[in-house]
Amino acid sequence: MTTQLEQAWELAKQRFAAVGIDVEEALRQLDRLPVSMHCWQGDDVSGFENPEGSLTGGIQATGNYPGKARNASELRTDLEQAMRLIPGPKRLNLHAIYLESDTPVSRDQIKPEHFKNWVEWAKANQLGLDFNPSCFSHPLSADGFTLSHADDSIRQFWIDHCKASRRVSAYFGEQLGTPSVMNIWIPDGMKDITVDRLAPRQRLLAALDEVISEKLNPAHHIDAVESKLFGIGAESYTVGSNEFYMGYATSRQTALCLDAGHFHPTEVISDKISAAMLYVPQLLLHVSRPVRWDSDHVVLLDDETQAIASEIVRHDLFDRVHIGLDFFDASINRIAAWVIGTRNMKKALLRALLEPTAELRKLEAAGDYTARLALLEEQKSLPWQAVWEMYCQRHDTPTGSEWLESVRAYEKAILSQRG
C-alpha cells in the first residue's frame, strides 16, 4: 500500500466518522452486493447460434470497434480480463444464444449440457450465473411476435424455449449454490396503429402461465419478467408493457425486471423501486443508460445510477434486489465498456453506503428540508474516492484509471490479432 493511499484512507475514515459513518462497515456491506455483468457486451449480442446473423427484436448495437469475441473461448477470456479490473463480487448474465454445441440445437431443445462449459468456468472463477431465453434474432420471431404469437405452433415453440431455459437456469443455481435469476423479455409489438391490443396480451398471459407451470426450487431459480415502452419496429404497441408485467409479477409473485432504458425518457426506475417492492417479492434491475431512447449506452456514475444505488441501500433491499447491467456499445473497446460500467455501478453503491441516511431521515421526519438538502449536497464533497481506492487495493484491482493500461496492453496483444 502506498503511503499516499494510506494517508488518504486515514483522512477519509476520520471525515466519514465525523458524520457517523463507519467506512469499514461500508466496505463489508459493499461485498454483499454482487453486480451481474452481461456477456453480450463482448460480442454485440451475436451469440454462438448464428454469429453472422442480424440482430433483431428492435434493439441495436452500433459501431464496429475491432476485436469482438468470436467464440465462447474468446468471450470467456475477455470476461476474465475485464473482471480482473473490477473489485468485489460479480456474477455473469448469459443469454440462451450463448450455448455451446458441436451440432445445431433448436432453441426449444436447449439443455443444461449445452452450458456445462459456462458452469465449470463460473466455478473456477467463483461466479454466480444468471440466464435469459433469447426471443429474438430467429426466423420464428421475424414477424415481431413470440410468446404472444397468434399462430399456436409458433407460440408453443417460444413457450417450450422458455421452459427449457428455466431448466438451464435451475441447473446453474444447483451447480453454483446461488440462485440464477432468469429474465423473460420479448420484443412482441407492432409498428403502427394496432386495433386489437387485448388478444396478444391474453395470449401472452396464458403463455407465461404455461412457462412457469413447472415448479422449480427457488434456491436454484428465480423467474423475472421485463417490460418495455417500445422498440425499433414496434413503436406503436408493445404487448409486454409496464402495466402488463407489473400486474403479472404481482399476481404470480415473480420478480419484476426494471430496465433503465425501457420507459419514457422522463421516467426513471429509481422512483419505481420502492413502489414495486410493496407488491412483488423481488426486483431485477437492468442498469443502463438510455440516450433519447433505449440506446444501451455504457453506464455512467450519473444522477440516475446513483439514485438507483441509493434506493437499494436506503431501504436495505440487499436480499430482494438483483443488480444487473444491460448495455452494448460496439463503438469502443468492449472490455473497457464492461470495466467502466461495472466499476461505476459499484462506485454508486459505495457512495450510497457512505451516506448518513439515519441523520437524513431524522431531518426529513422533522420537516427540516433545508438541512436535508444541505447535507445531501455536502456529502458529495466527502472523500469517497479514497475509500473506493482502498476497496480496489484490497481486491487487488487497479485504482484510478490505471486499469486502462491493462486494457490497452490486452488489446495490443490479443484483440488486435482477431480478424
UniProtKB/Swiss-Prot annotation:
MF (Gene Ontology): L-rhamnose isomerase activity; manganese ion binding
EC number, as in UniProt: 5.3.1.14
Pfam families from the UniProt entry: RhaA (PF06134)
SUPFAM superfamilies (alphabetical): Xylose isomerase-like
Catalytic function, reaction form: L-rhamnopyranose = L-rhamnulose
Database matches in InterPro entries: L-rhamnose_isomerase (IPR050337), Rhamnose_isomerase (IPR009308), Xyl_isomerase-like_sf (IPR036237)
Chain sites annotated for binding Mn(2+): 262, 294, 296
Pathway involvement of the protein, from the record: Carbohydrate degradation; L-rhamnose degradation; glycerone phosphate from L-rhamnose: step 1/3
Cofactor binding, note field: Binds 1 Mn(2+) ion per subunit.
Cellular component, GO annotation: cytoplasm
Record key words, sorted: Cytoplasm, Isomerase, Manganese, Metal-binding, Rhamnose metabolism
Subcellular location: Cytoplasm
Entry's Gene Ontology BP terms: L-lyxose metabolic process; rhamnose catabolic process
Cofactor(s) required for function per UniProt: Mn(2+)
Keyword Isomerase attributed: yes
Record's keyword annotation contains Cytoplasm: yes
NCBIfam families in alphabetical order: PRK01076.1, rhaA
Subunit record text: Homotetramer.
Function per UniProt: Catalyzes the interconversion of L-rhamnose and L-rhamnulose.
Entry similarity comment: Belongs to the rhamnose isomerase family.
Protein name: L-rhamnose isomerase
Species per Swiss-Prot/TrEMBL record: Escherichia coli (strain 55989 / EAEC)
Biological classification of the source: Bacteria, Pseudomonadati, Pseudomonadota, Gammaproteobacteria, Enterobacterales
Gene that encodes the chain: rhaA
